A protein has these predicted regions:
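Helix-loop boundary and gating motifs at the non-cytosolic
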Residues: 9-58, 221-231, 235, 242
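Helix-to-loop junctions at the C-terminal end of transmembrane segments
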Residues: 64-76, 161, 256-268, 354-355
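Structural signature of the two symmetry-related core transmembrane helices
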Residues: 79-93, 271-285, 367
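Cytoplasmic helix-loop-helix junction between adjacent transmembrane helices
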Residues: 109-144
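Intracellular juxtamembrane helix-capping segments at the cytosolic ends
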Residues: 117-130, 309-323
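C-terminal membrane-cytosol helix-exit motif in multi-pass small-molecule transporters
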Residues: 172-192, 376-380
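C-terminal transmembrane helical hairpin of 12-TM major facilitator-type secondary transporters
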Residues: 270-313
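A late C-terminal transmembrane helix in Major Facilitator Superfamily
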Residues: 326-356
Length: 386
């Protein structure tokens, strides 16, 4: 199916399989993301080491990311996604027979090589078929599906535990759920085309604000998923409660993503982006002031999760708006890689800040980047609106 023919069908119907796959990806991620940080924390490794190990996923994705559009163009969207999912299944099993930061750093790197494939290809799929007037809401539904899966992940950990082989084997089994909705569309998924006249540098400069949103949003989300459970333990609650904080963080996305997506379709997306970034800055700034055992921390984490999560889909909508006549495949890949780069820089930076300043190091690091994005978006909005 070509992009034009895909677009002629109902965009929502065309996107159903990728939405379902993204929900499964979110579920698997919600189970997997806390495992390595909590295991290394239990073994006594410092937070800088934890940040470096978890950052190797991003290194793997960056090392392989530029090849994803070409592979999807040559072999098809669904085949490359399914092969990557099964490779990830084997890597999850390998965690159960290894231990320590060196072995897990290598496995996390390999996971990054294959883990970025279904994510990047699914976003190219969406931006290929979506209508401009619905772009914000489509990206909101995408965010809700991923977040819904992620919110269930820590609940799964309450059943299987956060330590030992059981949670990793659970992740391996959940990989199969990603492939199931894609297989019927092996030959009918939208065809991904590559513009031979463009390159990654040129597509970045087509939408610099969107790319900055990817960086800041990626830094915030990946730092939260790596360090929010660790922050919670340091603040005086159990590891299981810390994992549930992640559920609350992601639940905010489910609650707030659709109204923010609606705003992105009806108001200037640069203004919406600025609002999300600046409110997120305030929320992470007050988090250390909220007692970890009070109900107020739930509300703070919920709002922070929902509003900060919106930075990514609003940025993705800005991207599609800016490069709709250009190379959307390369632009989407660059967007995802810059998102990963944000986490690659932010995780060790936040780990070091938390080693130096304890729990306030988390909010201070994130507030700095949220502030930079918010002010930049405001300046661009005011300048282009003048």
């Amino acid at each position: 199916m070509s992009p034009s023919s895909a677009a002629s069908a109902s965009p929502w119907r065309t996107l159903l399989p990728v939405f379902a796959a993204c929900a499964a990806i979110g579920l698997q991620a919600g189970v997997a993301l806390p495992l390595v940080p909590l295991a290394l924390e239990r073994e006594g490794f410092d937070k800088l080491t934890i940040g470096i190990v978890t950052a190797t996923w991003g290194i793997g994705m960056l090392a392989f990311g530029t090849r994803i559009p070409r592979l999807a163009s040559r072999f098809g969207a669904v085949p490359v996604m399914v092969i990557a999912v099964f490779a990830g299944l084997l890597i999850n099993v390998a965690y159960t027979v290894t231990s320590g930061p060196i072995a897990w750093g290598l496995l996390t790197f390999l996971h990054g090589l294959v883990g970025g494939v279904p994510w990047v290809v699914s976003e190219i799929w969406m931006n290929t078929v979506v209508e401009e007037s619905k772009r914000g809401r489509v990206m909101a539904v995408y965010g809700i599906m991923v977040a819904g899966g992620m919110a269930l992940g820590p609940a799964v950990l309450q059943v299987v535990g956060v330590y030992g082989p059981a949670p990793f084997l659970t992740c391996a089994a959940l990989s199969l759920l990603v492939a199931v909705p894609l297989l019927p569309h092996w030959h009918t998924a939208p065809r991904i085309r590559i513009d031979g006249g463009s390159n990654y540098v040129s597509v970045v400069w087509l939408a610099p604000l969107a790319m900055f949103a990817a960086f800041a949003g990626g830094l915030g989300e990946q730092v939260a998923f790596s360090f929010l459970p660790v922050y919670a333990v340091g603040a005086g609650v159990s590891a299981e409660t810390g994992a549930l904080w992640l559920s609350v963080f992601v639940m905010g996305n489910i609650v707030l993503q659709w109204p923010i997506g609606w705003m992105a379709d009806h108001f200037d997306r640069r203004a919406v982006l600025a609002g999300c970034a600046l409110v997120s800055m305030v929320l992470v700034g007050v988090l250390p002031l909220v007692p970890a055992t009070s109900l107020f921390v739930i509300g703070t984490v919920l709002l922070w999760g929902g509003i900060s999560f919106a930075i990514y889909p609003v940025g993705l909508a800005l991207l599609g708006q800016s490069v709709k006549s250009g190379d959307i495949a390369r632009a989407n890949t660059a967007f995802s890689m810059i998102y990963i780069l944000g986490g690659l820089i932010g995780r060790p930076m936040t780990g070091a800040a938390m080693d130096l300043f304890r729990e306030p190091g988390l909010g201070g690091t994130l507030a700095l980047f949220y502030c930079a994005l918010g002010l930049t978006a405001l300046l661009v909005w005011r300048r282009k609106g003048a």
